[in-house]
Amino acid sequence: MNQLLNKLSPYSHILPRIVLATTFLVHGYPKLTNTDPITAMGIPMYVIGLFEVGGAILLLIGIIKDWATRIGALLISVIMVGAIALVHIKDGWQGNEWQLLILAVCLMYATKGNSINKGS
């Protein structure tokens, strides 16, 4: 069993990356294509959508390019900090656990890049 898991280890960062990228593509695209001048906490929705979609695309490109992983994760981290501070903080822990989890995963990708499985 350990042998199989050791063989799969170099690829373990791909599934969470795909799930994270898909989530932000699905949530960001409608904001990006909305032509109404809607704002969330004073920020135009298309700007939020640009960060979400751009971050997601960069995370996917990041499967083969380390720099894209780091930049994509940082873009999504900015969105998550804003979501926590401006929208979800009023709900306490019950309203922030998912946002904090996404932020933690993004910070891991931002700091480790594609060296997640290399022990560096």
Where does each model-flagged region fall?
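Extended, low-polarity transmembrane helix blocks
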Residues: 1-33, 44-50, 54-57, 61-120
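Surface-exposed loop/turn positions within long extracellular repeat scaffolds
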Residues: 38-40
